[in-house]
Amino acid sequence: MQVLVVSPPLIAAASLSKPLNSLSKAALSFSRAKPICPFPQTSRRPISVYKSPMNNLFNRLGFGSRPQAQADPSSAAIAQGPDDDVPSSGQQFAQFGAGCFWGVELAYQRVPGVTKTEVGYSHGIVHNPSYEDVCTGTTGHNEVVRVQYDPKECSFESLLDVFWNRHDPTTLNRQGGDVGTQYRSGIYYYTDEQERIAREAVEKQQKILNKRIVTEILPATKFYRAENYHQQYLAKGGRMGLRQSAEKGCKDPIRCYG
């Protein structure tokens, strides 16, 4: 049987904004102790698949581009509109996509100055998607964590440090064993200052790496809160009932399990 080897594009143009983003060597220094994993390896979560055979092949290899779903124009307009939720007084929002949102949320829960975290879906073309919808790979959504933070106690730079250390931003549409556009790397900003800081950080990080970063930097779009089951998943114990600390400043390794 002959196997067709397809050389994937370096990046999916539709998935990226202006400059690409980057990361320091320290960001890739993950613990090797088991059962700790830097990004989800065995999450038991559905892998995104596309409907056409060729797209399915690319997606399984982790090189797919954003899916082209047939969405109602009015639905897409809402989904691609700005996040109209309002943070608490004196607080700011930021959204981050860095693979499976369970572990990413716990990492941000531990940051002093972060006052609230929620996991959800954004940057898709379907209004009110479910987890199952997103996992088909046809809605365009990314799994994200929306962070509410007090800028007097927590800088946007410190949130970016967590972002870089939590995942590998040089892998397109995948983190570890999780494959699909819903696991893509992304920074979604709410202010011009956040955008500036993110782009400057990317330029600095990219100078250190020997791989090109594929993180997208885009304005935050409408945030769809994920089902309650997914909220604070690891802090609640997950499927295995093994709770992990969300205490501020906690340095315990984050164990990934579904």
UniProtKB/Swiss-Prot annotation:
Record-level GO BP terms: cellular response to oxidative stress; response to light stimulus
Modified residues (Phosphoserine): S245
GO cellular component: chloroplast; chloroplast envelope; chloroplast stroma; cytosol; mitochondrion
Catalytic class of the enzyme: oxidoreductase
Keywords: Acetylation, Chloroplast, Oxidoreductase, Phosphoprotein, Plastid, Transit peptide
Protein family: Belongs to the MsrA Met sulfoxide reductase family.
Designated name of the protein: Peptide methionine sulfoxide reductase A4, chloroplastic
Organism expressing this protein natively: Arabidopsis thaliana (Mouse-ear cress)
